[in-house]
């Protein structure tokens, strides 16, 4: 098992795994065309890695990506975790915690003061994970579904 920075070659070599992970993430939270959304996110991942605006770390087992965390700098003080996923077969082994520590380490090295993320209020395992890693609830997102007549 290896935790390391992800580069463009890793994204290309692990395209199938990444798209499967994105499908798991997206299908839980949206009703949009999942395949198109996965392609869009995967393409952005490659662009943001190429222009160094993404911070991505991955967990690898024999060169196969088994999870990743993708963050970016909002401003010099605040970093946002955009996507975070560990393959179901590898959960509860400390991989997520190690990936999170890598993001924290990199943010501290750049003098960042805060890491933020969104988590759905019914994703209890994620909420528990973040609380265990010293994250605290800081806001509540409100939304209204509009009816189209």
Where do the language-model regions lie?
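Acetyl-CoA-dependent GNAT
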Residues: 2-78, 82, 87, 100, ...
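Loop/helix-junction capping segments adjacent to catalytic residues or to phosphate/diphosphate-binding pockets
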Residues: 12, 93, 124
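A generic structural signal for beta-strand entry/edge sites
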Residues: 76-78, 114, 139
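Conserved acetyl-CoA-binding loop-helix of GNAT-fold acetyltransferases
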Residues: 86, 92-105, 128, 132
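Conserved active-site alpha-helix within GNAT-family acetyltransferase domains
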Residues: 97, 121-139, 144, 148
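Conserved GNAT acetyl-CoA-binding A-motif
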Residues: 100, 107-118
């Amino acid at each position: 098992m290896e935790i390391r920075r992800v580069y463009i070659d890793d994204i290309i070599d692990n395209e199938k795994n990444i798209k499967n992970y994105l499908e798991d993430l997206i299908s839980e939270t949206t009703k949009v065309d999942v395949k198109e959304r996965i392609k869009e996110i995967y393409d952005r991942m490659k662009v943001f890695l190429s222009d160094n605006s993404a911070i991505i770390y991955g967990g690898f087992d024999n060169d196969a990506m088994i999870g990743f965390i993708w963050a970016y700098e909002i401003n010099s003080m605040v970093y946002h975790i955009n996507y975070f996923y560990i393959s179901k077969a590898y959960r509860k082994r400390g991989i997520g915690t190690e990936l999170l520590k890598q993001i924290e380490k990199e943010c501290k090295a750049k003098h960042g003061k805060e890491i933020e993320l969104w988590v759905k209020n019914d994703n209890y395992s994620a909420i528990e994970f973040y609380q265990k890693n010293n994250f605290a609830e800081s806001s509540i997102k409100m939304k209204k579904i509009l009816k189209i007549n």
